[in-house]
Regions:
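Basic, flexible Lys/Arg- and Gly-enriched helix-loop patches that mediate nucleic-acid binding at interfaces
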Residues: 1-185
Length: 186
């Protein structure tokens, strides 16, 4: 929300009063005087007017968790243990997951209460690479490198994935970098 709108609604001031107070340097965001009416105010920002705290600013939390197999990448699930169940943190119900891993997949999970950050990280338009260390039972065919580079066609979804980078690390190990999250793409 813009600072002028926030102050108008929170302090019940007219637009004219808000403009005057802000231009006089009487508003602070995160301890710094701001004279910018259209400055974005987030739930994590501390907002003051004339030295009075209107919003203390919530602490943004970013957690890394190693997801074990047999655990669901979800905040709630009636049938299975979730990654949130693994955390012993206050206010863990405020957290959500940035990304997902399949039920029996292990790896790094990122959790946060900062929705804007997690959207930037996980939206397909960001093309943020997700790196997987893959171990297989059978040897990996070297032709898979080119197949991932072209993109894989999934008949059940009738789509071709974005190109991905597969680097062979051994006969049964590879590093795979994906730029989208398709079900069972790994």
């Amino acid at each position: 929300m813009r600072l002028d709108r926030y102050l108008g609604s929170r302090a019940q001031l007219s637009r004219q009063d808000v403009r005057r107070l802000v231009s006089d340097g009487r508003a602070r965001v995160n301890g710094e005087v701001t004279r910018t009416l259209d400055r974005e105010v987030r739930i994590f920002d501390c907002v003051e007017l004339d030295g009075q705290v209107l919003q203390p600013g919530k602490v943004a939390r970013y957690l890394m968790l190693h997801k074990p197999p047999g655990c669901v990448s979800a905040t709630r699930d009636a049938a299975h243990r979730t990654v949130i169940d693994l955390i012993d943190e206050p206010d863990k119900d405020d957290l959500h997951i940035a990304g997902r891993l399949d039920f029996n997949t292990t790896g790094l999970m990122l959790l946060t209460n900062d929705g804007q950050w997690s959207r930037r990280l996980t939206q397909p338009t960001s093309l943020q690479g997700k790196v997987y260390l893959v171990e297989t039972e059978d040897e990996i065919d070297p032709g898979c490198v080119e197949a991932f580079a072209r993109g894989l066609y999934f008949r059940f979804e009738d789509l071709t994935t974005l190109p991905a980078e597969l680097v062979l690390l051994g006969p049964r190990r590879a590093r795979l970098t994906l730029h989208e999250g398709r079900y069972h793409q790994v």
